Amino acid sequence: MSNCAIVGINWGDEGKGRMVDLIAKEYDIVCRYQGGNNAGHTVVNEYGKFALHLIPSGIFLKGVVNVLGNGVVIDLEHLWGEMKSLMDAGIEITPENFKISERATIVFPYHRALDGLEEARLKDKKYGSTLRGIAPVYSDKYQKKTIMMGELLYPEYLKKRLAGILEWKNLTIQNVYGAEPYKLDDMLAWCEEFGSKLAPYICNTTRFLYDAEKSGKNIMFEAQLGALRDIDFGIFPYTSSSSSNAGYACVGAGIPGSHVDRTVGIVKAYSTCVGEGPFTAEWFGEEAEALRQAGAEYGAATGRPRRVGPIDLVATRYGVQIQGATEIALTKLDVLSYMKEIPVCVQYEIHGQKTDEFPFTAVVDEAKPVFTTMPGWGCDISGVRKWEDLPVEARNYVEYIEKAIGCHISYVSVGAARDEYIQR
């Protein structure tokens, strides 16, 4: 038995889906353990290009079982739409290869509405939410006022529970935001419409994973977002509302804490960020637009242009430490091929003092990047499949990052397709 977590080291959008699609062939099960449809994992394979927001990236591999764990929050309407789009593209999805935890939490339409209402109230102080209802539903979960997927299978129980919750939610919707209340019959009809389609996939995934482990199956745990968006260790409050930490895989999937023995951290060869909050090495203007265009940096979930900049080694080293990464996959190295010189953020300067340490949230916005530059390679590397065939400048860049973050880089992607990578 060998279990692996695939996690983001930075702000998310590092290329986790692409690496899961590559590495998952070594595993029997791929399990998403946190988050909702607020971020997307982009996968390019023989079926086409897909942006997955809930379904694990192992869904394209025959013989691999894909699981949404208890730590995931699920918008029924979105999940069914995602499943249908995959099935329409010829991807097989059955209760045998896709399972949904009965303990996963449902994101209701009123959660989405509350997300938008709160962002509107905050105005220029907003957090940059994706407006998918994630913060409201996790807030409700910890107040024990949410509905679990398994409750869809018990209509009378669901009706009783939802009636009490909706009465409470409408107090906030009406009295705080002055918006129209939600009707119980409408919410029950929504549950029936989409819950009936999803019912065959809902089961006790904790028991399924337990039995799978016991029989020697290998499990991969797929995270959403990255260390700097983690609710505990990220740049608070500009974080997600769940833990994107590798350590949460055990909680969000329901397995013992000692059972993850490999953690692959995903790092992009430059920095990107979607949403608000400090982003120390950020570029602006023509410089940023050139990098954004070269890397096609637009959010998979929102379509928003991503904020971009050079790789930030201070933030990356912190992410490696927080995630406990045992190895690194460096993605999108090919994007930097247009640069004659490649800037690298090696330190921060705060109040005149240079530091290698990632600072506490209260002062991170005051940090200024300290850059060095490295020679570019100036040629297309997307056809390279062996480490020794990379230009020496590209190898030097990878090795410089590896030394700075203190973790071996075992994979280097040089393109979006499944086979466009180098294993060291």
Which residues make up each language-model segment?
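Non-transmembrane, aqueous-exposed alpha-helical and coiled segments at domain scale
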Residues: M1-R424
